[in-house]
Amino acid sequence: FNFDKQVNIEADNLKISGAGVWHTQLHFTSDKRYGGGIVFGHNSNGIELSNLYMDSNLTSRYNEDAQYKAISGTLGKDSKIHDIWVQHFEVGMWIGDYDQTGNMKYTDGLVVENARIRNNLADGINFAQGTKNSTVKNSNIRGNGDDGLAIWSSISNGTNAAAEENNKFLNNTIESGWRAAGIGIFGGKGHEISGNLIKDVFAGAGIRVNTVFAGHNFDLNDSGIKIHDNTILRSGTTNDLYKLHRGAIDFQQVRGTIKNVDVYNNKLLNTLADPVITKNFEMGDNGNGEIRLSNNTIDNKAAIVGAVSAVSPTKPEPKPVNNPVSETSVSETPKSEGGSSTPVSEASTSEVVSETSASETPKSEASSS
C-alpha cells in the first residue's frame, strides 16, 4: 500500500492488523517534511497496531527538519504495538502529547513488543512528553542514527508535560547504532532497564544517563531508576561526534544532577573505550551516593560465541521498495520533538559468553542528536 501523505488517526479501541510483516507493507512515498508516517491523535485510547511492515522514501534528517516519524502522537491508555517492522523513517516511534492548551493526554500503559525497529535516521523509539507505565520488550533495534531506545522527560515549549515515570526497556537487542547510545535515559523517575543485549554501538555509549536536554531531568526521581542485568558488548568510543570518550555506560551532568540511579549486575564486555564507565563529574568506583554502582562485571577479554538477536526471521528479507537511506549531515543538534541499509538476517538466537577475567570495579563520562 502506497501513501503520499501522513495518516492521521484518532479513535478509541481501534485494531489495525495486517497479514504479517511479509505480506502487508505500508510504503510512504514522500520525502518532504511531515510527508509520512502514522500520527495518533490527542484523544486516542486502546489502540492495537500489529502485523505489518512500514518504510518510506525519507533520506535525510538534516537540520532536524524532517518531522517524519513512522509512528507518533499519543496512544492514551493501554495501547499495544506488536509484531511490526519499521525502517527508513526519521524515527521509528516518538510517543508524546504536544498539546499547548494545557489539556495533556498522556500515553499510559503502552506495550511495544516483538518489533523490529531498524535503519532509521534518528531514534529507534523515544518515550517523551509525560509517557508513563510504558514498555518496550522482546524487540530488535538495529542500525539507527541516534539513541536506539530513549526515555526523555521533556517539556516542549507551550506544554505543561508531567515527569515521565515507570517506563521499562526489557529483554531487547539493541545493535549497530551509528550515533548516540544504545539506550538513553534523560530524566523522569521509576524507570527500569533490564535484560537487554546492547552490542556494536561504535559511535557512543551502550547506555547513557544524562541531563543534557531540557526537561524534568532527575529532580523528581524519588522512586529510583534501576539499570540491571544488561549485557553491553563491543560498545563505546574514544572519539564521538564531540571528540569525547564514551564508555559502555556514560554519565553526563549539564542541566542538573543525576539522582537516585542504581546500576548493578551488568556485564560490560570488550568495551571500545577506556575507562569502561565514563562521566564528566567526580564519582568513585562504587558511585557517588546518588549513582550507586555494584556487582558490574568488566571484561575486555571475553570470549564470545554465536550471534544474538531478539527476532530471528524465518524467511528471506523483503526486497526494499526504496533506496537505502543516506545521512547527509552528522552535525549534532538538540533532539527533535514531535539509517542504514537493507537488513541482515540473524544467524542464531543464542550466545555463550565466557569471561576470561572479571572485575567488579566500574570506573568512569554523554549527549544526543
Where are these regions (language model features)?
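Leucine-rich solenoid repeat scaffolds
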Residues: N280-T314
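Short glycine/acidic-rich loop motifs that flank beta-strands on beta-rich extracellular proteins
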Residues: F3-Q6, Q25-G37, L58-D65, E90-G96, ...
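Tandem-repeat/low-complexity and Cys-motif detector
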Residues: I71, G102, G215-N217, Q252-Q253, ...
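Right-handed parallel beta-helix
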Residues: N13-H23, N45-S56, K77-E90, K105-A122, ...
